[in-house]
UniProtKB/Swiss-Prot annotation:
GO terms for cellular component: cytosol; endoplasmic reticulum; Golgi apparatus; membrane. Residues 1-29, 400-423, 570-590, 993-1033 are annotated as: Disordered. This is cGMP-inhibited 3',5'-cyclic phosphodiesterase 3B. Residues 408-423 have a biased composition (Polar residues). Abundant in adipose tissues. GO terms for biological process: angiogenesis; cellular response to insulin stimulus; endocrine pancreas development; glucose homeostasis; negative regulation of angiogenesis; regulation of insulin secretion; signal transduction. Residues 1-28 are annotated as: Interaction with RAPGEF3. Mg(2+) 2 binds at D798. The chain crosses the membrane at residues 69-89, 110-130, 140-160, 170-190, 198-218, 225-245.
Length: 1100
């Protein structure tokens, strides 16, 4: 019985009956993501024949059934006629016909291929011209093509029959001209396009030549007739296909729409984005009314958007909460209502009945809020990246709106903002959604202070900033085990902290080494906090205790010392709820009724606490501005004692750095840090950015220890590059327009020691002054932050250099090459390793007084400057710099543009990195010796690995002169010329008389002429580029640049050495040629002797 019922109900289940037309929207239980609709059934394809596949192969649409039936009937009639003719003939006729057929077949077998080629040529030409003139489709504008074969061959046939002088072989050219004339007249009739007419003429000449040369087996009179016949057949076939068949590219003929009876009812999934989920009708469900959908909209229904909006509001709160009973009430709205009721209770003019009612409502809402428990947020929203804010007055924060939790570019809804009725003067501090590195989102109980009976968020909450408790490592590990990013550095977590014991208020906990967060940290690390600067303490005693504690909290992005904030103790004798709430504001009213007396006491308490807070803040700022005397004492005495002598040695382009290294002896390992400290003192960068000396020296000593003891790319090279960028940016430059004067570079700072908003600091060297207004200086046109980034980049630019080139690392699949995808491998490694060192320990944080935006800008500039030292990108930078600074159509360098200043700094560090050939001869040879030894070490390793030895790195065949000459000619020379042409090289004006100037010009011309007699044209051009004529200013003034002078002299010396080597090689070659005259006999004897020795060894 059950089986019969199931069989009877099965059809109803497969095709449920449609609902009545008058039915309203279906019940909510049926709206489960599926709708009833009707679809057209799939039709079975008809059987395919050979003719159908042939049409598909020819790219045409198969004909209709009626056309196919007529074609079959015609073929049948033709076959019957042929069969009847054969049956009615006599046997004798069959024999004669067979003999004639054999003769015809023997002749046609030799002519079949040319005839078929002619037919195909006419077929494809007709198809092309037909569709090119009209496009695909039916029409009657191309039937003139049927006359084309006749014009090609019938004219030739007539000339052959009636003009006997055209029958010889030499008259073939005349017959071809006759054919082309006939075809040309034919193309004029239908107004063929010019290119099509030319194509037809070329085609006619080609097919005539095929007929003339390929049909030699046929009689001469029969050749044009058969050619015309097959050509006409090809044209006719092409026109027939174009007339009776459709091209597949054309739109097919419209088909009749399916009737309602052909549709089958089905149940299908509903397209969520094409329905109005909160007000759709039955017609939309059953497919009777179409709802057009914009294809650009996301497939998300309105219910999903509402749920998403609500969930996102919860995620963006500092504490993700919801009611335990699952009632789905937004606690932020509930707490807003409680705040508004509490504000109304303060009004003394309200009647007692209203006050009683309001107190009852507040108690009910407080009881409901107290029953809610927080839930762990398993999602990590992206709150944006806020800069570190400075010390703010809590009173001023009360009327300020929260930061938006999400970027304005996205389409996500923003969290609900705090609203206040303004009926009371209570503080309404609003805490933004923050991210904590150590503990993620903490509960209020964990952040409160258990001693002294403190409670949280009562009506008398003062919301002062104190020191939070430290969460144990086991809790942090348990809570964030699944949320940490795979492969993250362990230093980015507080699990390595040595202190895990809760401390009392006013003390600080240990902090792990700082890290540099990026945007991915906010998505993968929910425990990152965006903090407040240090400056918010509850008392002066707490502040001094903090200064004595070395384990201070540091910002992970800008290095500021910070204090995390929690609520403090409340006055005794007041009951407060201990439960948490989901309100973003930290001032949540309790369930107990309030009165006016308590409110006045609260205001008095808040004023007292605020005065204490501001007092502690002032002490903090005073102490932060005072220099740390103990740290200065711990520094190396050499930094202070030899400052004057060291800066005097460095005030020269030819800084004798190797003599300084020998003088320092065992302390030469600290040359980079000492020179860096000296330069920062000279330029005033230590005072401008409030750089602590101890952290500064700690970092740069660790940085120079990371340089390897290799011949060239060591700490001495880094120090030389640092000196070069300092010299190029602080020495006087003739004719450079100076944007900021010396008195304008000293910017005034605020009372806290920081620059005011909108002010830009500029520096100047204490060891050098600008002689007059005809000189300028790069330090007056480039802000101090950018120059400091340039100096730091020079110190970092070859950190942890392995002594091998990028090409070697790529060829050997080194880990760095794999990590950086073979692009600027060493430069990326230097920058990343140097910044990793800076972020590894808090005692390296010498940039702690930079705000967030300054630090981000500084880091960007340092990385860009280091990456610019890649010689593979040398010519790209050179072309860009020439287009900006030296192009006649360019406006020159705009010092107000950050991009132009960045380009100047990049070219400056590039020039400093390869400044060896621009030094005097002794320094240049010392640097050349270092780079050559490093090259030879790489060549030895390449030979050991079986790799081809790179150019100039083979120790067995030294080419020192060619290496340096090529390096100067192609790399250093063009860069220095471009930098000099832009007017950025330091130098001095030289007063000369007209006669002296003329003589110097003549001497230069003579020198160039003498050199041109011995060198080729390329060397002459290079020599002219490296020997620029003295630039005359104001008639009798020219510029002398020490850098260009040394570069020119070194280049001349290397060229002379190359010439001497070439002459020596030529002399040795001539000697070898003279000696080789008697060598053949000796060679033969030597070969015979070797053969005899081999035979003796074989016999032995």
């Amino acid at each position: 019985m059950r089986k019969d019922e199931r069989e009877r109900d099965a059809p109803a289940m497969r095709s449920p009956p449609p609902p009545p037309a008058s039915a309203a929207s279906p019940p909510e239980s049926l709206r489960n993501g599926y709708v009833k609709s009707c679809v057209s059934p799939l039709r079975q394809d008809p059987p395919r024949s050979f003719f159908f596949h042939l049409c598909r192969f020819c790219n045409v649409e198969p004909p209709a059934a009626s056309l196919r039936a007529g074609a079959r009937l015609s073929l049948g009639v033709l076959a019957a006629f042929v069969l009847a003719a054969l049956l009615g003939a006599r046997p004798e006729r069959w024999a004669a016909a067979a003999a004639g057929l054999r003769t015809l077949l023997s002749a046609c077998s030799l002519s079949l291929s040319p005839l078929f080629s002619i037919a195909c040529a006419f077929f494809f030409l007709t198809c092309f011209l037909t569709r090119a003139q009209r496009g695909p489709g039916r029409g009657a504008g191309s039937w003139w093509l049927l006359a084309l074969p006749a014009c090609c061959y019938l004219g030739d046939f007539a000339a052959w029959q009636w003009w006997s002088w055209l029958r010889g072989e030499p008259a073939a050219a005349g017959r071809l001209c006759l054919v082309l004339s006939c075809v040309g007249l034919l193309t004029l009739a239908p107004r063929v396009r010019l290119r099509h007419g030319v194509l037809v003429l070329l085609f006619a000449g080609l097919v005539w030549w095929v007929s003339f040369s390929g049909l030699g087996a046929l009689p001469p009179a029969l050749r044009p007739l058969l050619s015309c016949l097959v050509g006409g057949a090809g044209c006719l076939l092409a026109l027939g296909l174009d007339h009776f068949f459709h091209v597949r590219g054309a739109s097919p003929p419209p088909r009749s729409a399916s009737t309602a009876e052909e549709k089958v009812p089905v149940i299908r999934p509903r397209r969520r984005s094409s329905c109005v989920s909160l007000g759709e009708s039955a017609a939309g469900y059953y497919g009777s009314g179409k709802m057009f959908r914009r294809p650009s909209l996301p497939c998300i229904s309105r219910e999903q958007m509402i749920l998403w909006d609500w969930d996102l509001k919860q995620w963006c709160k500092p504490h993700y909460q919801n009611s335990g009973g699952g009632n789905g009430v937004d606690l932020s709205v509930l707490n807003e209502a409680r705040n508004m009721v509490s504000d109304l209770l303060i009004d003394p003019s309200l009647p007692p009945q209203v006050i009683s009612s309001l107190r009852s409502i507040s108690s009910l809402m407080g009881a409901f809020s107290g029953s809610c428990r927080p839930k762990i947020n398993s999602f990590t929203p992206f709150p944006g990246f806020y800069p570190c804010s400075e010390v703010e007055d809590p009173v001023e924060k009360g009327d300020r709106k929260l930061h938006k939790g999400l970027s304005g570019r996205t389409s996500f809804p923003t969290p609900q903002l705090r609203r206040s009725s303004g009926a009371s003067s209570l503080l309404t501090n609003e805490h933004c959604s923050r991210w904590d590195r150590s503990s993620g989102k903490r509960s209020y109980q964990e952040l409160s202070v258990s001693s002294h009976g403190c409670h949280l968020n009562g009506p008398f909450s003062s919301n002062l900033f104190t020191i939070p408790k430290q969460r144990s490592s086991s809790v942090s590990l348990t809570h964030h085990a699944g949320l940490r990013r795979a492969g993250a550095l362990p230093s980015h977590s507080l699990l390595n902290s040595s202190s895990h014991v809760p401390v009392s208020a006013g003390s600080l906990t240990n902090r792990s080494p700082i890290g540099f967060p990026d945007t991915t940290d906010f998505l993968t690390k929910p425990n990152i906090i965006l903090h407040r600067s240090l400056g918010s303490v509850s008392s002066a005693a707490d502040f001094h205790q903090y200064l004595r504690n070395s384990d201070s909290n540091l910002c992970s992005s800008c290095g500021h010392q910070i204090l995390k904030y929690v609520s403090t103790c409340e006055p005794d004798g007041t009951d407060h709820p201990s439960e948490k709430s989901g309100e973003e504001d930290s001032s949540v009213f309790s369930k107990e009724p309030l009165n006016i007396v308590e409110t006045q006491e609260e205001e008095t308490m808040k004023k007292a606490c605020r005065e204490l807070f501001l007092e502690g803040d002032s002490h903090l700022m005073e102490e932060a501005q005072q220099p740390n005397i103990d740290q200065e004492v711990s520094l190396d005495p050499m930094l202070v004692e030899d400052y004057d002598s060291l800066i005097e040695k460095m005030n020269n382009w030819n800084f004798q750095i190797f003599e300084l290294v020998e003088k320092m002896g065992e302390k030469s390992g600290r040359i980079l840090s000492q020179v860096m400290y000296t330069l920062f003192q000279d330029t005033g960068l230590l005072e401008t950015f409030k750089i602590p000396t101890q952290e500064f020296m700690n970092y740069f000593r660790a940085l120079e220890n990371g340089y390897r003891d290799i011949p060239y790319h060591n700490r001495v090279h880094a120090t030389d590059v640092l000196h070069a960028v300092w010299y190029l940016t602080t020495r006087p430059i003739p004719g450079l327009p100076q944007i900021h004067n010396n008195h304008e570079t000293e910017t005034k700072a605020d009372s806290d020691g920081r620059l005011g908003s909108g002010q830009i600091a500029y520096i100047s060297s204490k060891s050098c002054c600008i002689p007059d207004m005809s000189y300028g200086c790069l330090s007056s046109n480039i802000p101090a932050l950018e120059l400091m980034a340039l100096y730091v980049a020079a110190a970092m630019h070859d950190y942890d250099h392995p002594g091998r080139t990028n090409a070697f690392l790529v060829a050997t699949n080194a880990p760095q090459a794999v990590l950086y995808n073979d692009r600027s491998v060493l430069e990326n490694h230097h920058a990343a390793s140097a910044w990793n060192l800076y972020l590894s320990r808090p005692e390296y944080n010498f940039l702690l007084n930079l705000d967030h935006m300054e630090f981000k800008r500084f880091r960007f500039l340092v990385i860009e400057a280091i990456l610019a030292t890649d010689l593979k990108k040398h010519f790209d930078f050179l072309a860009e710099f020439n287009a900006k600074a030296n192009d006649v159509n360019s406006n020159g360098i705009e010092w107000s543009s950050e991009n132009d200043r960045l380009l100047v700094c990049q070219v400056c560090i590039k020039l400093a990195d390869i400044n060896g050939p621009a030094k005097d001869r002794d320094l240049h040879l010392r640097w050349t010796e270092g780079i050559v030894n490093e090259f030879y070490e790489q060549g030895d390793e390449e030979a050991a690995l079986g790799l081809p030895i790179s150019p100039f790195m083979d120790r067995s065949s030294p080419q020192l002169a060619k290496l340096q000459e090529s390096f100067i000619t192609h790399i250093v020379g063009p860069l220095c010329n471009s930098y000099d042409a832009a007017g950025l090289l330091p130098g001095q004006w030289i007063e000369t008389e007209e006669g002296d100037d003329t003589e110097s010009d003549d001497d230069d011309d003579d020198d160039d002429g003498d050199g041109g007699e011995e060198l080729d044209s390329d060397d002459e051009e290079t020599e002219d580029n490296l020997n620029p004529k003295p630039q005359r200013r104001k008639g009798r003034r020219r510029i002398f640049c020490q850098l260009m002078h040394h570069l020119t002299e070194n280049h001349k010396i290397w060229k002379e050495i190359i010439e001497e080597e070439e002459e020596k090689c030529k002399a040795e070659g001539n000697k070898l040629q003279v000696d080789n005259a008697s060598l053949p006999q000796a060679d033969e004897i030597q070969v015979i002797e070797e053969a005899d020795e081999e035979e003796e060894q074989m016999f032995e």
